[in-house]
Amino acid sequence: MSTQEITTTHSNIIVSHESIIHPTLKGRSKPVVGKQLRAPRDPPVSLEKKINFYIWVLTIMLIQAWQDLKTRRWFKPLQRDDVAGHYFYVPIGRLNPRILLSAPHDRVLIRTIPSSMTRDYEELDDFSACPEREIVNAGSNNYGGFSRSEHNSASLIETTLRLLPFNPPPTELSSRVNEELAAYMGSKTCATTTSGFSANLLAFQTAAQTAEKLGRHCIFLLDAESHASMFTGAFINKRATTHRFKHNDITDLEYKLRVLKAKEPDAHVCVAIEGIYRQVDSTVLMITQGNKQLISGGRGSFEWWQARGYDCPLQEIDIMTGTLSKSVGCIGGFVSANGLYAAELERQRTLQHQNGAETLSTVVLVRILSLINKPKFIQERMTTLERKASFVADCLAQAGCDILSSYGSPVVCFPVGTIQQASRFHEEAMERGFAVACGVPPATPLWSCRVRVCIFATTSWKDILDLINMIIKVSCKLQIKGITSTIFTPDILPKQYPDDPSIAEQSVKSDASLCSYVESLSKTYPGGDLEAKPPLNLPQSREAVEASVKAFSKYGLGPSSVRWFYGTFDVFIALERRLAKLYPSLEHHSGRCRAMLGTDAHTMMLSLLSACTNPYTSGVVNILFIPTTATLAVHDGANLNRPRAETQIIYYEKMDNLVAKLRKLSTAASKLHLTLYLQTTSHDGSILDLSATVQMIISEMTDPNQLKGLKLILDDSGGLGKVGPRHLGYLDLMEREHGVSFLKKLLGKKLAPKTEVVVTGSFFNAFGQQGGYIISSASFVEVHTAAMSEKVLEILSRGSS
């Protein structure tokens, strides 16, 4: 890269996820918010507030313990930290749940769960008695408001759903999206992914493989508060070394670079950041723009700074990632690359396709094309978004709010104190008809939790004003330090201008052209409305198409967030409940079951294996057995965490090898917990003999008391949709052949109480639909939900300086 700095002043410009440094610019009349290059100051907390906080924590934990005792639902921890999750984090997350009944637009229809049933609402069979209402959405990441269909774009999406296959998409369409998105981003090549998380995995893999081909040692240097997916992407590349530098500290970054270059001059150093830092000589620059793509200027942080007179050309970025859910309003992500990384990214993209990796759905790809071909529309949205976000920041700053985010950022972030304060703020906002997001430990300091207010370009000015006044009123009620009672009236709202008719004209013309393109593709790639898509016949296929059109009309293409604090779609809960009751044999063995959905099966499998490799309980050695034929996600997940003495990972080629290794272990450790990853179907179509596998393992245990626990992970990616009388997978087949009690019978009375059975799989492999799932006991799914939180994943995977 060029040694020229991207700044035209002597100021260092640092852009990250939530805390952006913005120097004063000539001619600016507005005050600059978040301008100090410093870590956020934690508000002072009195001894009385600390005591009240700990009393509140203890109360929540005791209530949860009483609930467990009353219902006789005994909690089984997956790992050591799960106790805090079960007795505290999960209960406070359930205090104010909301279920989304519509797309996550600026206004959203929700179903509110009464406080009398919030702790058990996931067990309710019928939500119809819970009241519905519309609220202002300031909690989702749909900043550009692109979840709403502009002009005639809804017709384009419906045509795509009817005429083209849902997934996998036509090859020609995928190629066109990669080419046009690369051109839009000013890069040489591009690859789409099923999530922003998987985009960062691909980006780091591309950088590491490039370094390996150059014969150089790859070193990743990350901001200490980078997104969890960045740390995960770095750590799964075991031949690379990962280091951190202080958050938003350019001086520490330059110091670390000098030290690394002095120690290893030939190293391939990759600086990976969220936003923009000053370029440094001979250093690779990787940018992740989860919250900036199609938000800041339309092409992320770089274009945002370019508009302010700074020299930061997109072409000088080596690798960039983006998240579509926070920009286009669709699930997915992308990676773009320049220079020598372009060829490696193209190679990785080809390998993923050859290995049958999940792909974005056809409608998402069409939506990407639709938006990036509307430059006037995007520019108008970006201008509107910045005006509204700046207005909110100005008003809150005037009222004394300590804004931590940058001026003009669509995420307005400020500290509110303890977790109790954050929870109360969330509750008070909901009561007043507003949804906001909260940041709590471990993502924030204990005494400085955050409220994150998300601004949409499509939020009306009236709702913007009401949102500001609500924040101030609630802050005063909660006695948040520094905020004074202030009421802003409509007369301060900025002047509004009529829409430019050329924007709609360009939009309609672009979508009409794309609609013709979709119709031409359907002649070669007919969709479910035109021919049957196995395992469905033609009438069923057409029924599925009509259901998808109705789903788009109700929910849009955009995703929702995790249930706790943010809210999730009612249809997601319905699917989870259907999955939880899918296998009577699993319920017969585990009791009450739950299911969990994932954006993509690869990331879900990675997180599942990562969680299962952590210490089980004190004094027990956790042994994980993995066949060498397991997928890359399984291997990466098992090796993600730092090595521990209490955990061992053993790979085997055949079951005989596993038995031999287990025989050695049984004499070396006094207490064992075994985790077996098993594929229910092999590549040749043969079915797993679970009974023989379990009996073979048990026969090698000289002392039955030595085995403290057994976890069976049944990967049904090759079974769901293919085997069983209902095509519901491995357990469906076993239930027909052996009855619903077969799990208990094969495990026996002594082993069954010690055994956790986890069923996981891929909707993509089964039905061509994006996503993965986990089905197990209610306690396992609960703790795994907590274990999958982004910050926890990053903490678990720490192993480098």
Name each region found by the language model.
Residues S2-T7, R148-E150, E179, A183, ...:
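PLP-dependent enzyme catalytic core of the Aspartate aminotransferase-like
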Residues N141-N142, H243-Q293, A532-K533, A645-I713:
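Active-site phosphate-binding strand-loop segment of PLP-dependent enzymes
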Residues P104, I113, A154-S195, V545-G598:
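Conserved N-terminal alpha-helix of the aminotransferase class I/II PLP-enzyme fold
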Residues S2-P165, K495-L557:
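N-terminal "arm"/small-domain region of PLP-dependent enzymes with the aminotransferase-like
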Residues G297-Y407, F414, Q420-Q421, K711, ...:
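Active-site C-terminal subdomain of aminotransferase-like
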Residues Q79-R80, Y87-V90, I99, R381-A393, ...:
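Conserved PLP-binding catalytic core of the aspartate aminotransferase-like
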Residues A224-G233, W447, T628-P643:
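Short, glycine/polar-rich helix-capping loops at beta-to-alpha or helix-loop-helix junctions
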Residues T206-A228, M596-G598, L608-L632:
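Conserved PLP-anchoring active-site segment centered on the Schiff-base-forming lysine
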